[in-house]
């Protein structure tokens, strides 16, 4: 495969092949704007906003102000998951009973009667004239990306017609082939090491090959070469990348760029808790992958509560994403409000989080360390 870096830099008008991962719940506009100002591509998580046009527009206007430029070198990231299945009311009810017991054991009052749908899915948008699609075409961010699957074909084509590049997260060769057949502009190859939610098209795939980032990149590049694909989408590597050496190792495959998330979490421009920050500064625990928190596999730093929740939650007993996230987020918040501390929280991070603390909370200094030899 021919090197994609120069084409990537020219297409997106950036100095470095660096994308900041969206990281819903931890990232901020300030973080995204700083990465863009420094010559990379900042990302704004939009998972909860696909039906909220005013909020999308406000976020992007505020981003422009922080960057001091209206070029909109930014990645707006949406979720394209399958909506929760109908006919699982009994599973949802048993999950609420499970949380009633957890609350009782913690000494906190439980009053939740149903699981709320925290995140709409962009997949439900099928009309290119939908207000959100029309707004995005007007706003013209450089990239609109999707996690958990592909949006509707007509929506992809409509956005691309306005010169917006469409990216999607993939975790294996089959998903890459789907993305290629859908004529996407870029694919984020998410390795098993990545923190946060696993981007599988199929939720909690029991046949997930769990390919590490290096192996996934090698697999896809080999496929591109063997299939004689002359104009592949931009290939972005993600997962476990924590320093300039790990970046250079992946760029040797001639891919376009890398996407980093966990390395930014200790920054003062991320919104992690003091307890989460301490885990970076003095790492003691491994990470774990579990679907019991949100309904989809995600990687978090392991804690006794999270291990117990995972071990006591067979996949068949877990409601569909994102329903369990409602009960989990409520518990984490209620525990803090009740003075129980952070023991019922999640601490999302990649498997190399213990290598991610750079002895600084400055985004600028972290960025400088990452690109020093690129």
UniProtKB/Swiss-Prot annotation:
Question: What does the Swiss-Prot or TrEMBL cofactor note state?
Answer: Binds 1 FMN per subunit.
Cite the binding residues for FMN: 22-24, 238-240, 261-262
One molecular function GO term is:
nitronate monooxygenase activity
User: Key word Oxidoreductase present in the record?
Assistant: yes
Per UniProt, which keywords does this protein have?
A: Flavoprotein, FMN, Monooxygenase, Oxidoreductase
EC code(s) of this entry = 1.13.12.16
Q: What InterPro entries does this protein map onto?
A: Aldolase_TIM (IPR013785), NMO (IPR004136)
> What cofactor(s) does the depicted protein rely on?
FMN
Q: Which residues form the active site?
A: 197
Per its record, the protein catalyses: ethylnitronate + O2 = chemical entity + acetaldehyde + nitrite + H(+)
Q: What class of enzyme is it?
A: oxidoreductase
Q: List the disulfide bonds.
A: none
Q: Where does substrate bind?
A: 197
Function (record text): Catalyzes the oxidation of alkyl nitronates to produce the corresponding carbonyl compounds and nitrites.
Instruction: Describe the family membership recorded for this protein in Swiss-Prot or TrEMBL.
Output: Belongs to the nitronate monooxygenase family. NMO class I subfamily.
Q: Can you say what this protein is called?
A: Nitronate monooxygenase
Q: What is the lineage of its organism?
A: Eukaryota, Fungi, Dikarya, Ascomycota, Saccharomycotina
């Amino acid at each position: 495969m021919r090197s994609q870096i120069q084409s990537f830099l020219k297409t997106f008008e950036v100095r470095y092949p660096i994308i900041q991962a969206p990281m819903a719940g931890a990232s901020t506009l300030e973080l995204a704007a700083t990465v863009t100002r420094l010559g990379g591509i900042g990302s704004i998580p939009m998972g909860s906003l696909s039906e909220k046009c005013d909020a999308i527009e406000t976020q992007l206007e505020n981003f422009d102000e922080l960057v001091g430029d209206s070029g909109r070198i930014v990645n707006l990231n949406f979720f394209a998951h399958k909506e929760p299945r109908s006919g699982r009311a009994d599973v949802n009810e048993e999950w609420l009973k499970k949380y009633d017991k957890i609350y009782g054991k913690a000494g906190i009052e439980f009053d939740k009667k149903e699981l709320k749908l925290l995140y709409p899915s962009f997949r439900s948008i099928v009309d290119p004239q939908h207000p959100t699609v029309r707004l995005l075409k007007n706003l013209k961010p450089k990239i609109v990306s999707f996690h958990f699957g592909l949006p509707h074909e007509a929506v992809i084509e409509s956005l691309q017609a306005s010169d917006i590049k469409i990216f999607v997260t993939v975790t294996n060769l089959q998903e890459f082939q789907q993305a290629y057949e859908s004529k996407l502009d870029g694919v984020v190859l998410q390795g098993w090491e990545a923190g946060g939610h696993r981007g599988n098209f199929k939720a909690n795939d029991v046949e997930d090959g769990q390919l590490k980032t290096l192996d996934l990149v090698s697999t896809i590049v080999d496929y591109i070469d063997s299939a004689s694909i002359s104009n592949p989408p931009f290939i972005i590597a993600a997962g476990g990348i924590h320093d300039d050496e790990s970046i250079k190792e992946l760029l040797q495959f001639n891919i376009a760029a890398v996407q980093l998330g966990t390395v930014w979490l200790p920054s003062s421009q991320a919104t992690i808790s003091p307890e989460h920050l301490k885990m970076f500064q003095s790492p003691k625990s491994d990470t774990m992958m579990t679907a019991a928190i949100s309904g989809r596999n995600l990687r978090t730093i392991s804690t006794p509560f999270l291990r117990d929740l995972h071990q006591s939650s067979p996949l068949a007993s877990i409601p569909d994403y994102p329903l369990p996230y409602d009960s989990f987020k409520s518990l984490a918040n209620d525990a803090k409000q009740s003075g129980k501390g952070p023991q019922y929280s999640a601490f999302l991070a990649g498997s190399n989080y213990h290598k991610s603390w750079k002895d600084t909370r400055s985004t600028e200094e972290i960025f400088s360390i990452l690109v020093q030899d690129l």
